[in-house]
Structure formats: structure tokens, C-alpha cells
């Protein structure tokens, strides 16, 4: 009923870690700008980008601060774009010092929306899988939204209802920086040493991908590739809470529970 719904909404507000906080959004690409638009009337928001001059035409001039101003402000939260390498950027010292305050737009999304979500990650095939799944859900008349690395930034969606389902393509960088994001359904397609780059080594890259699975509760489900040796080896050495469903891609995608 309406009263129960109101109680749930009030609880969500009490639990929200971003409402009313002093927040720095670092990186003014698509995800950074959408984070600003979403949070601007919910928190005290400031902006920074390594290339400030290029970003002054976004109509956000009064909110953009320079390096000296940023270093003098005590922020509660720092939301960074996944493209930023915290060890090689203009705010590197500040980010290292405030590492526990770093979040992503995925964290903001999760703190405001508790809808069912299906989050897809892996080295290869994320976009194709996300698109296919989104099309299947639309075909079955679900209110599906394709967001993340593909489609809209996660905070740019409008007219969200309780029935909205989110199909999220998540990169290892997004997952690595996220602190509270979790998902009802996780899909881990594969892991290979193709996109290690900023992660420095395979171990860090694998750990970033596995954050998606480690964050899940016992009410969640993870679909993993039975034929991927790196995934299977990591699964053996982790006590995961959720239901694990293995998909055999070499045998007509047979499902093994």
C-alpha cells in the first residue's frame, strides 16, 4: 500500500550515503556530466577535469574548480569517471589520500535505485551480450534499459518505475573503483590478459572483475563461463554467497547448476 511504499522510500533516504554531502565529481565526460545533473539538487556538488578549458562550455562554469580550490575543500565523497587513472592524473595525491571516499556512478545509481539489474562484465563480448539480452527483454515487453559502457550513462535514464530492469555493461575500471554497487544478476563472460593496462598485472585485473561477484548476496545469481580456466580457478578459491550457474559454451550453452 501507499504507506508501506512511503516507509521504504524514507528508509532509502536515511541509508543514502550521497544525499546532502559535499561531493567532487572528477571527469566531465558523459558519466561525469550525468552524475552532476543527477546529484546537483541532492548534494553540494563541485566539478573538476584534467582539461578544464575544454569543459567550460558545458554551462557548468560556476561549479568547476581549479586544482588549488579543490585541494582546500574537504569532500565527503569523490565520484570519478572510469577513464581516470588515480595514479596518473592531476588529482593523484588527493585521490590516494582519500581513497576510501572514491566512488563511481554505479555506486550513486545503486544508492538511489534498488531495481533488478543484470550486470555483464568480461574481457570480450560484453556489448554484444548486453544488447542481445536487452532486446530479448524488450521483446518480452519488459521495461528494459541498456546502460553503462553501452547505451546511456547509468544516471541519465528517465521515467524509471519499480518494474524497470537495468541491463548494465560494466568495465573492470568501473568495478574496481566502486564501493557499494551490487547487482541481482551478474554475468562473467570470460577473463583473458587482453585489457590489463592500468591494472598493471593479471591478478589485479581478475580481482577487479570478481568484485562484481564478491559484492553479491545470497539472494543473487551469478552466471559464469564453465570453460574459462581463470574464472574457474578463482571460483574455487573464493567463498561466494550467491547461487552460481555455470554455462558450458562448448556444449550448446548447457546450464549446469
Model-flagged regions — what are they?
Residues 51, 68-70, 108, 150, ...:
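Short, solvent-exposed coil/turn elements at secondary-structure transition points
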Residues 2-104:
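N-terminal leader/targeting and accessory segments in enzymes
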Residues 21-22, 37-40, 71-74, 82, ...:
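Phosphate-binding loop of NTP-binding sites
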Residues 45-49, 146, 167, 246:
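Short beta-strand "acidic-cap" motif of Rossmann-like dinucleotide-binding folds
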